[in-house]
Amino acid sequence: MEKYLSVVKMALERGIVPRCHFEDITRADFYGFVVPFAHALAGLSEEAGIPIKIRCCDTLGLGVAYPGASMPRSVPGIIYGLRHYGNVPSSLLEWHGHNDFYKAVSNAAAAWLYGASAANCSLLGIGERTGNCPLEGMVMEYCSLRGTTDGMNLEVITEIAEFFE
C-alpha cells in the first residue's frame, strides 16, 4: 500500500488528478485493506486539495448485485462500504465491471443505485475475455429505472449494432 500511496502523493504534488483503480475488489480484503486504503487516499486528497477518484474494478466479473450478498462480492456492500466506512463521496466513486458471468449490467446498475456516480461501459460490451458492461444495456437500464429516455434516440442502438456487423 505504501508504494502505491507514494506514487499518488507524487502525482498530487505535480497537480495531477489521480484515478485510483481498486483492482479485483470483489476478491479483496474489504475491511482490512480496501477501507484503510480509501482512508489513506482521502488523507492525501485533503492534504493536497485535489480530489482522488476511486474506480471499483470487478476484474473477473464476480460481483453480485443483490442486497444481502456476502462481502467482498456484494456490489451494494462495496459501494455502501466505501461511502459510509471509507467516507468516499459518491462523486468520486465509479464502477468498472467485466461480464464473465453475465452480470455486468446488473452490477453496474446496483453500483449506481448504491451511490457510484459512474459506470464504465463499452459499445456492445466489447472488451477483454467475455467483455465489459455494454453501453446500450446501461442505456436501457437507465431508461427503465428513470421511466424516460431523457431525449436519447434509442434507435441508434440498432444502427450501431448493424455498423459493427
Where are these regions (language model features)?
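Catalytic cores and adjacent flexible loops of soluble metabolic enzymes
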Residues: M1-E165
